Structure formats: C-alpha cells, structure tokens
Amino acid sequence: MNPYHRPVFQIVELNPYAPRPYVFTEAASCLRDSIRLAGYACSLRNNEADPRGISIVLGAWQFGRTMVEALDRNRTIIFNLEQLGATDAFPGKPYEDWLRERIVFDYHAGNIERMATTAGGRSRFFEVPIVPTPSLATSGHAPSAPEVDVLFFASESPRREEIVRRLQAAGLTIDWIRGGAFGTDLAPAMIRSRIVLNVHYYQTRLAPSTRMLQAAVRGVPIVSETSVQTGRCDWSRSGVLFADYDDVVEACRTLIDSPERRLQSVQRTLHFVARLEFALAFEEAITALGFTTAYDTGHFASRNLFS
C-alpha cells in the first residue's frame, strides 16, 4: 500500500476552559468545516496536536506559545485573529516579532500588509478568510421571538460605554455581555435579540469577521461601526449595516423599527456568505507552502499541549 496521501490538517484550538467555548471556538469550527468542504481531511482538537501533522493553531500566543514550540514549525501554521499595528492593541510588538518567525494565516489583508513591510516580505504570510458555516447554529437552542433590541458582546471601553448610553437614551433595550460570550454560551442571547452590534475597540478598525460568524448563520441582523474591509471577505457587500460612530444609534433604530429591513439584511448576508471563496485562498496558501506534496500520514500519537 502506498503510505503517501493527500495532506491531512488539524485545527488546534488552545482553550484553557475547554470543553466550554472560548474566544477562538467559533473560528476554529468554521475553519475545520471550510477545509473539509475544500476537499481535505481536517479534525478539530482542543489543547492537543499530532506532532507530525499539519497544524493550524488558534490562541497560540495567548494560551500556549511555549507549548507550541513542541511542534514542527514547518508543519505548524499560526492563525492570527488579532489586529496588528494599533498602538493600544494586545499583544503588540512582541507578538508581531514572534509571528515573523512562523508561518501565518491571517483573516485580514491589513495585517498581511503590515507584516510584509516590517518583515521584509510576505512569503510566509497568507490571507485566509473565516467563513461562517452552519455548524454554529446547531447548539440545540430553538429560535424564539426577540425580547431585546440590541445584543452587544464585547469588553468595556469609554467609546463603547458612550454608545450604550446613547442607545439607552434612545429608548432601546440592550443586552451587553461584558467581556464577551462565545459559541453555545452566546446562543441564548443571540436568538432573543433583534440585532447584533459591533463597535470598535482599536483605532485600526479592521472588519471583525469573528464577531459576524454566529449572527450571520443564525439570521440575526448586524449593525457595525464603519470598518476597514479586506479583499477576500468584504463584509460591506453583505447585509451588515455599517455606520460611522455618531450614526450607529440611528442605524440600530433603522433596523429595529423595520422588520422588513431586518429580513432584507439577513437575506443579503446569507447570500454574501454563500458566495465567499475559502477554497481558493486555502489552496493558494498550502500550494505556496508545499503542503500539497505527498507525505507520510502513518499513525502517530497526540501530544497534549497543556501537559
């Protein structure tokens, strides 16, 4: 039997709270689903990896960068979901320096451009979109009639607090989950809300793809502060209603006051998601990295990265 086969991938979510969902859980699920739809075998693992496999790691810097060193760098891809270049951004320059030594997939072209100029080239940095997939809506929570006008799941900042005050002054009801919620933990709040809101924390204002995922799949309209879009996943072409900071409250009112507009928003977003092209970006990246060549996929043991 020929021991060489098409490459097999594994999404490695570093999550100190597993099996509860956390920051990267939704993105990890969508990546697994998208890679499978592209025609490749792909598993999703929490806090462990097959050391001879091709790993795509989420949360490496935050929850286990030392542990990730146990993996072969030439078979390990770091998926960056942070906003690079913001003066107040976590985790800042040390993280960028760490990324320069690795293979990186990134959700946004703005981050790629920054790394290309500061790292002297882009040969190991690739834009790969996070595409919403139906698995995010299979949490077992049945749809219900909306009870809350605005769902806002985010950490606190003065500009966000000001928007919440303005929404309340406009007579809107708000469910602000401070610090955020994720995956199945977010689902109950999602299904009882008329709209989901995004207001930026960092001045880079990169379009927050991960904040769109579950709302897009569950059919909840989204209002977002104006964002810097990216070529492979330009949410301005969807039904998301973008507005400048001072116009966010009015944008929320526009959707909340009109069930017809909310329906149109959802339909446009679902159409947009259905047309997003993941496979091409993924194939281009793994071909450039040489991962489409045959390699041994014989049995090997998993390594727990938190042990």
Show where each model-derived region lies.
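Hydrophobic/aromatic beta-strand patches that form the interior of the parallel beta-sheet core
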Residues: 56, 77, 103-105, 124-126, ...
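Short, charged, surface-exposed secondary-structure boundary motifs
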Residues: 86-93, 114, 134-140, 162, ...
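Extended catalytic core of nucleotide-activated donor transferases of GT-like folds
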Residues: 8-120, 134-135
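Short hydrophobic/aromatic-enriched beta-strand-loop microsegments
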Residues: 78-79, 122-129, 175
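Catalytic binding pocket for nucleotide-activated donors in carbohydrate/polymer assembly enzymes
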Residues: 7-16, 22-36, 40-43, 113-121, ...
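Short beta->alpha connector loops
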Residues: 59-64, 82-85, 110, 129-132, ...
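Conserved catalytic-core segment of nucleotide-activated headgroup transferases in glycan assembly
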Residues: 20, 131-192, 259-260
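A short, charged/proline- and glycine-enriched loop
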Residues: 2-9, 50-52, 142-150
